[in-house]
Amino acid sequence: MFKYVYHASRVIFGGWWLYSGAMHFISPAWQPMGHEPAAIAFTHALIDSGLFRWVKILEIVLGITMLAHRAMPLTLMALVPINVVIVYWNLVLDPATVDYVFGALSIVFNLVLLWPWRAHFYPLFVGRGGADYGLQPA
């Protein structure tokens, strides 16, 4: 059963990432700026600095890899920091019922998508390890 929940979440979330990233280039006016001054200022700062364009490019690339079900551990690792900012924006900077729902769904989708790949992330939590300084692939 979880396999179907996983794949449904992957398609929905991947589609959302692709859509959200592409809409920035198709119709820039579509971008929600928020209703609270902090959310508006934050979004303007991202846009004015040029960082927002790179985030949207990443959203497109990662949405495609998620929909194609390729490089999932790397895709998820790249999406989590972006999601942390989005959840913060939804829950703290621009709090409203719809934003709470989107923030909560982002967390749920992340957990559902990360769970089957958890074994790939365990090595990242090694407290002390031996580095391999050789030039040969591991």
Stretch-by-stretch model annotation:
Residues M1-A29, R53, A68-A138:
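Extended, low-polarity transmembrane helix blocks
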Residues E36, E59, A131-D132:
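Glutamate identity and glutamate-enriched acidic tracts
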Residues T43-L58:
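Interfacial helix-start motif at the membrane-water boundary
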